[in-house]
Amino acid sequence: MKKIKLYILLRSISKDEFDELQDFILSPVFNKDSTVISLYDFLKLNYDAAMKGSLSKEEIYRYVFGEEKFNETKYWKLTSGLSKLIDKYLMYQFYEKDSYYQKNLLLDIYRTRNVPKLFETLSKEIRRSFDSEFNKGLSFYFNRTHYYFQKLSYLGDENIDEFEVDLKKMFEDLRMFFIMTNITSVSIISNFKEGFIKDAKKEIWMFDEILEYLTKNKNKVKKENHIVYIFFLIILIKLDPAKEKFYFEIKDRLHNDRDKYSINLLRHILINLFDYAVKKFITGNEKFLKEIYFINKVMDENELTLFGEFIQGGYFYSVVEHSALLGEIEWAEEFIGKYGKYLNEDYRESGLNLAKARVSFELNDFDSSLMHLIKVDNLDHYFYLSHKVLLLQNFYEKKDFESIDRVLETAKKYLKRRIEISDELKENFVKFFDYFRKLKATATTRIYLSKNLYKELSGEKFFIYQKWLLKKSKELALPQRL
């Protein structure tokens, strides 16, 4: 079952959505095929097996068609029928959530059917809702442009006097729509493609001119188009990470109006703030660890942590580790309990055990931490290196210096390979392993150098795990009256 479109679609919807799908399938407006209803009933009875993809096509066919001989073409038609209904259900969901799209569509129907009274009544209603809208993002300008276009296309006695004003507003909204499309696209792509934001100034048509326009009209945009202004600030901190004041300005705006933002806009803003905060943290700005924690909590409080029905393995562990580094162990444990079950199946066991190992280590339960680490597979570069860091820290606390040598050697070889993590994050790991090697040597054969090691670490620019290394080197140096 795992190879068919139906399985992929089922995995993409929540249990609540699956249950809601029943009403959609039973409605004769959307479905008149009784075999599709039978298929849905079978999947509902065997929901867990369906989610795992462990149901065979023969089992499915037998339930729907009884003892009839299996027919491959009939089976594919059956599963395709339910897949198409799920597609329609998802589109219907989207349609139901977009009130502006619905009203614009109805306005277009009134226009083409030539019912001016209904057109004018609805037009005024739409206008009032646009005027009071807080979330003036990409879809807002798209829908309002469409609205003005329809008004201008249907000139009647009621709106002829507004023609010039509406024309001007339509082109202003078109400009904002183009600006939002441009800077939103650049913002999203830059989260995945290193260096893209700076290349965009040269390679993306009109991007540089848009930045020039927004800079020149900053105060006007800030007052009249606050969402555009926030997206502009996001671009500015990506272009120049040193401009921290813009990050904190966005944060203040979120704090003041958090309940007003739509889920999609809030998610986009938070993801970009998170990306910025992480980059600041791994490049040596320790204060941004608290910002990462703040963003993760806001994501959780607004039910934005999950992407669809899952949480990414790397993000899951990073939340736990960043919280642990701040000493927020209780919240980290709550996070593990709340979201561990949503890890992708490939990452679930390793992700949970790596996270639990981190928490156990912070609680000085080194035996439990090591027991969890045994169950971790090195699924990607971040997991592999984080796993090695925790192993070394646990072995050091247990004075297992023989095991330390083996881990250090494998980590050293691994870092010499070309691995797909940012140069900044890689540098953090390199520094940790280098200083850990010195710490181990000091602890075993050169205790007299502990004071020098502590001073050397103290003079370093901040890097991840530096505090732990400082603490351990200080413990070695204490007998020498540091």
Where are these regions (language model features)?
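Helix-turn-helix repeat elements of alpha-solenoid scaffolds
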Residues: 119, 199-212, 240-253, 283-297, ...
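C-terminal structural cap/anchor segments
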Residues: 350-425
